[in-house]
């Protein structure tokens, strides 16, 4: 994907997360927000790494040759958000990374079991996630902004 397309998708995923969270007819708010927010942050960091010329695809070495890992449908496997955050070149500060890793943990719970009503207990983390996303995608002094 092109860097610009990744940025657009990142922004739209976060906007969708906020819109769904604020919809009074939706009860699956936090879970949906977290899933879309993780996609948004992943695309944002993929755009950053692409801009920096950092290969964010999984691979293994076969002799001296680099062999890229692929999905069962033949697409390259790209780093998930936690791997993006753990990269030494990540532009994300430790507080934002900690917030995102907290949400990644909850996303794992969402994926593997039904969650109880969690909206009230994590709403501050969700607000921080969306605000930090806006800051990182638009603030010109941040390294993550793609030029």
Please tell me what each predicted stretch does.
Residues 135-146:
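Single conserved hydrophobic/aromatic residue that forms the stacking wall/gate
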Residues 25, 35-58:
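Active-site-proximal cofactor/substrate-binding loop regions of enzyme domains
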Residues 1-36:
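Charged alpha-helical initiation segments
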Residues 21, 44-45, 107, 111-114, ...:
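A structural signal for well-ordered alpha-helices, especially hydrophobic packing surfaces
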Residues 7-15, 100-107, 130:
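Hydrophobic faces of stable alpha-helices that mediate helix-helix packing
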Residues 125-135:
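Short secondary-structure subsegments characteristic of cysteine-rich extracellular domains
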Residues 49-123:
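A broadly used, surface-exposed interaction patch
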Residues 31, 123-124:
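Short, charged, amphipathic alpha-helical segments
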